[in-house]
Amino acid sequence: MIRIDAAWLATTPLDMRAGTDTALARVVAVFGAAHPHHAYLFANKRANRLKILVHDGIGIWLAARRLHQGKFIWPLAGGANLALQRPQLDALVMGLPWQRLADGGVITVI
């Protein structure tokens, strides 16, 4: 399993024909650098396809996901890039609503 310590969502669409080098160049342009164990998520304009680039400390992984029905819930283009918590990342990749997930439901004080 690939270790992911942080996940970042880019609001600008990415051409899904982009390969590893093009996606890596976009990560550097948008986020400044590709950090080890960070995942960077991009969607196409229709938000029915998703690409995730992960730097595992040794090399680069690029994964793609396509929804056959519906769309990924994606922020408007041109907005600020977002940091995602692990539950949000898991829900987003499954095509589920993810905005209200984070540490919700966690009780820390009795």
Show which residues each predicted segment covers.
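Polybasic/polar functional segments that serve as interface/processing modules
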Residues: 1-110
